[in-house]
């Protein structure tokens, strides 16, 4: 590569591009996250923040909300000496999402099955498979099951390399 040099070879002390602040210009991975660390909130804290979020938007007349994170994440945890299972987390999330769905039209990002009763639309419907080696054919099972039951929406199309093929996948799966 005529553009990049491996800094671990200690040959990067000269002939390298420098920024205005005299630091060596480095290439960062395009898939890197904006923040290095995220912390998970307890389900009770998530419910509290969600309640404030929903009330602030419904006061302004916004009745359609999209939620991500709590719709497709379950985890067990310990807090102040108590152990909570994924079932406990699911109960907390489902009761909170139930109350939110009574006030708003709720769009959930890849919701788990226990939340399908509360959602008005399924966002980011997976169109591909897991790409495991032992799979020889792909069947869009989830979209077949939910077709006509829930409105489904795919991932963002503008991030796809082959938009025509992706569009045909959406048509094929009914998304």
Annotate each PLM feature.
Residues 3-63, 71-175:
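Active-site-proximal substrate-binding groove within the catalytic cores of carbohydrate-active enzymes
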């Amino acid at each position: 590569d005529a553009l990049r040099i491996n800094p671990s070879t200690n040959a990067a002390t000269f002939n390298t591009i420098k920024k205005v602040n005299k630091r060596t210009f480095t290439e960062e991975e395009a898939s890197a996250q904006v923040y290095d660390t995220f912390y998970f909130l307890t389900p009770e804290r998530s419910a509290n923040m969600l309640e404030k979020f929903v009330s602030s938007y419904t006061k302004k007349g916004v009745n359609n909300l999209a939620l991500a994170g709590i719709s497709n994440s379950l985890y067990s945890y310990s807090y102040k000496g108590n152990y909570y299972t994924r079932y406990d987390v699911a109960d907390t999330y489902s009761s909170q999402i139930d109350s939110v769905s009574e006030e708003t039209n709720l769009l959930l990002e890849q919701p788990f099955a226990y939340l399908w009763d509360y959602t008005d639309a399924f966002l980011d419907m997976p169109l591909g498979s897991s790409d495991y080696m032992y799979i020889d054919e792909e069947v869009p099972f989830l979209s077949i099951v939910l077709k006509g039951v829930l409105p489904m929406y795919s991932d963002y199309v503008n991030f796809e390399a082959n938009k025509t093929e992706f569009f045909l996948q959406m048509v094929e799966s009914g998304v």
